[in-house]
Amino acid sequence: MSKKIQNPYKKRILSTTANSNQSFAKRQAISQTTVPSFSSNELSSTEQESLEQTLNKHFGFQTFRPGQLSIIQTLLKKRDAAVFWSTGSGKSLCYQIPALHTGKIALIVSPLISLMEDQVAKLNGVVSTGGGNEDKKDIAVFLGTGQKDQFAERKAVNGEYKLIYCTPEKLASGGGSFLNQMGNLHTRNTGVDGLCLIAVDESHCVSEWGHDFRPQYRQIGDLLRNHNVLKTVPIVALTATAVPRVQTDIISSLHMRNPNIVKQSFDRDNLIISVKRKPAGGYRSALKTFVDEVKKMKVPANAARRHSSTIIYCPTQSQVEEVAEWLSMALESTGVRVQSYHGGQGIEHRSDAHINFLTGKTSIIVATLAFGMGIDKVDTRLVVHGIE
């Protein structure tokens, strides 16, 4: 049986731009929202204007979305926060703005290399330091097995980036040596260096009740709260995937102290979800139907984007390879490019597939669950989960 989650063309997936504020506000109004202890009203007009100037300078937006100022203010006051918002609602800005506004550093723990690559590439494409092209410097970096710059970690611990992304494995690496380096960075007496917050992105991975439970995530709270220096740094947990008991488990596991909890509905009314019984001929019969539908579509000027973007998930790496190869051959005459992605492939192959999908050079990506968490691509129209 296969499950298809489709986003029809007439209903765009919410982007991370200010254009979706109206839809966001509508969803928030009908959701059950936890009213935070701090409200944006506690910000003086001067403070709010200053934060909005930072927002406009770095991202080009004029105003914050509902709830963002409350979370940012909480973190600037060195208080923990838990953000349970749907995908595309602007969670990332809640930890990006404090770092850019204060000139301090945000450490972000993220579960996947592909997710970190995506966020860092977009940040460095929009936000930078330096006056001209010759002295332009990246604002963000990720530390992990996919990092090609051998000096990236040295530059990070020297305070050359404002947003440092790492995996939970990196956080615990070297018997605590990386944490100690972050601690040294936090206590530097330079006036601007130091950590303003630690963000735990996709924090549902913390919970044993979560669908993506990851043991290394479970250690984050103990690692941070038992560290002599980092225990004072505010933590913000963010996820779009957490039922109430998972939310409670996240807060408990991370040892959050009186956090500002901000919720909204996770319902995405622009998605169509359908379940189809696998045909007698197996998944190849289902794929043939899919290929026939693609071939019937009108070809625009850019044939490679005729089907917009599709992700097909398979349960095993071998099936990923088989399905990707079959689709590539079946769609060869259409100009629709297909690539595969799974953890057994080399870093360069995965990076190439990831970038090509984000830039539209590849229309269909066949992958295991190693791909997809947090991927921000607004023209993704179809997600297929195949169950063999």
Where are these regions (language model features)?
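Helicase motor core with emphasis on the C-terminal RecA-like subdomain
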Residues: 45, 53-58, 63-66, 73-82, ...
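Conserved Rossmann-like nucleotide-cofactor binding loop
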Residues: 114
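Helicase-associated low-complexity/disordered flanking segments
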Residues: 1-81, 199
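Noncatalytic nucleic-acid binding interfaces
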Residues: 105
